Swiss-Prot record:
The keyword Lyase does not apply. Belongs to the class-I aminoacyl-tRNA synthetase family. GluQ subfamily. A motif ('KMSKS' region) lies at residues 226-230. It comes from Xanthomonas campestris pv. campestris (strain ATCC 33913 / DSM 3586 / NCPPB 528 / LMG 568 / P 25). This is Glutamyl-Q tRNA(Asp) synthetase. The lineage of its organism: Bacteria, Pseudomonadati, Pseudomonadota, Gammaproteobacteria, Lysobacterales. L-glutamate binds at residues 9-13, 45, 170, 188. Keywords: Aminoacyl-tRNA synthetase, ATP-binding, Ligase, Metal-binding, Nucleotide-binding, Zinc. The gene is gluQ.
Length: 297
């Protein structure tokens, strides 16, 4: 794990406006970076055009600015980085660590959707997968969720790096960019906890050092499901950011009294940095609706 100066990031996908769960991840990652005296960077993960919403990235950046969360460097857009992903993929193909595959989801259904061996001949539509040998396990110590171990071979199988439709897979793009940006600490929602073992396997194949990981609890809506754009979660109000900012502070387990009753966004964040305690972060995978923006102070 990295011994370099702390460098964190927040990396939303432009599929809609930021909701309260997004704000929690942004604020949590920002506070941890500031607490460590490090940098915090913003990356727009716009590698899936069919899911992207026009103007969403601009609105997301506007919302972050309204909440006083500014990137410590230029915003990186994954849509500008095809050449870097192609270079990494070529290395893996040349070394035999990756291979082309035309197996469809329907064809893999009989194997539980897990790919170990190709069951279809190569066709025009070809994905590229990372070869995951038998007995491949990945284990890491999450700073909040504890020790996580996964048998990547039996539970995941060969990992898609480039989809059959030509779009880059999340796993490849995030590993390449975290390494290129020198990210030492990945702080994100617990919905991505399951992705981490396969990213560790890919990092090893590419010869890059893994960052440290901390997965914040998810915010669940009144229906018990994760707040998400796909479930029509309400966007945070960037015209009146203080209520949501205070609610996110509480959801991170921090003492409400640490923030001044009357202050600007900048003033609230200044006090937040001074009084933030990582030890108070909730050591759970999810939080119920009581911690949402409408929770009492």
């Amino acid at each position: 794990m990295s011994s370099l100066p702390y460098r964190g990031r927040f990396a939303p996908s432009p599929t809609g406006p930021l909701h309260f769960g997004s704000l929690l991840a942004a604020l949590g990652s920002w506070l941890l970076a500031r607490h460590a005296g490090g940098e915090w960077h913003v990356r727009i993960e716009d590698i899936d055009p069919p899911r992207a919403e026009p103007g969403a990235s601009e609105r997301q950046l506007h919302t972050l600015a309204a909440f006083g969360l500014h990137s410590d460097g230029p915003v990186l857009y994954q849509s500008d980085r095809d050449a870097y992903y192609e270079a990494a993929l070529s290395r893996l193909l040349r070394s035999g660590a990756a291979f082309e595959c035309s197996c469809s989801r329907a064809e893999l259904a009989a194997m539980g959707g897990i790919h170990h061996v190709c069951v279809a001949p190569l066709g025009i539509r070809r994905a590229v997968r990372l070869r995951v040998p038998p007995n491949t396990q990945a284990s890491f110590q999450d700073a909040l969720q504890g020790r996580i171990t996964q048998d990547v071979y039996s539970e995941v199988g060969d990992v898609v790096l480039r989809r059959a439709d030509g779009y880059w897979a999340y796993q490849l793009a995030v590993v390449v960019d975290d390494a290129a940006q020198g990210i030492t600490d990945v702080v994100r929602g617990a919905d991505l906890l399951d992705s981490t073992p396969r990213q560790l396997v890919l990092q090893q194949a590419l010869g890059v050092a893994p960052p440290r990981y901390l997965h914040l609890p998810l915010i669940l809506g009144a229906d018990g499901r994760k707040l998400s754009k796909s479930h029509a979660a309400q966007p945070v109000d960037d015209s009146d950011p203080l209520p949501a900012l205070r609610a996110a502070w509480r959801a991170l387990g921090q003492a409400p009294a640490a923030l001044p009753a009357r202050a600007s966004v900048a003033g609230v964040l200044q006090h937040a940095v001074q009084h933030f305690s990582p030890q108070r972060l909730p050591r759970v995978a999810s939080l119920d609706a009581a911690t949402r923006i409408d929770a009492p102070a």
